From Swiss-Prot:
Main location: nucleus
UniProt name for this protein: Survival motor neuron protein
GO biological process assignments: DNA-templated transcription termination; nervous system development; spliceosomal snRNP assembly
Protein species of origin: Bos taurus
Upper lineage: Eukaryota, Metazoa, Chordata, Craniata, Vertebrata
Residues with Phosphoserine modification: 24, 27
Amino acid sequence: MGGGGGGFPEPEDSVLFRRGTGESDDSDVWDDTALIKAYDKAVASFKHALKNGDISEASEKPKGTPKRKSAKNKSQRKNTTSPSKQWKVGDNCCAIWSEDGCIYPATIASIDFKRETCVVVYTGYGNREEQNLSDLLSPTSEVANIEQNAQENENESQISTDESENSSRSPLNKPNNIRSRAAPWNSFLPPPPHMPRSGLGPGKSGLNFSGPPPPPPPPPHFLSRWLPPFPAGPPMIPPPPPICPDSLDDADALGSMLISWYMSGYHTGYYMGFKQSQKEGRYSHFN
């Protein structure tokens, strides 16, 4: 562009922000790890509060820790607690993870008999934590906890399965009722013909219809007596018939289309002939 003051600015003048050129550029600004951890922590705290019926802050579980139910009460822990003199290094046990209060299987790595404490390594996670010997639980505690969780999960899945079956069963019972209600005539237009059960296909020369042939046209006096006059507004167009799962075959669709063409031409020809006969009757009356 020209050098006048009213010209457009150069492309570099329109840049609002360019990453990596400023002195205050900080790559940590683009790291959302802390945000993700905060969100996961908030969700875990909310779920933990719902399970226990109270509000308590739940921090991160051991690495890869699945969801486990916390111990119901302290009496359950005391019933499964073994005396401290029975524990030795390498024994399998169950310990309560201090971060979430849930029971996990662990192995005793070291024991301090003077302080009556030990260091346990959580099986499958590798986390190490110091525990009191009196707080250790027998391995059967974890088995009972897993069985209880499995039973609760099975009950929840059964409830959700029953609800989905009920919701899917209710609409399946309606097509027969819909068809029976749609049978009576709602206007002066005749009901659609029955769907043919067979039609064109490989090795077939034509259509074979199982339904009876269309009835002959009614006489004019019957038509004028029983059919109401045409409305003054636009003609009423019936809605298309519902698509049934058993009529989604190509041959059935083709047969339905040919039937509709035939019925349309049939009624159109009858109406045109009826109007022609009326017109000829008026001419003969004047002559």
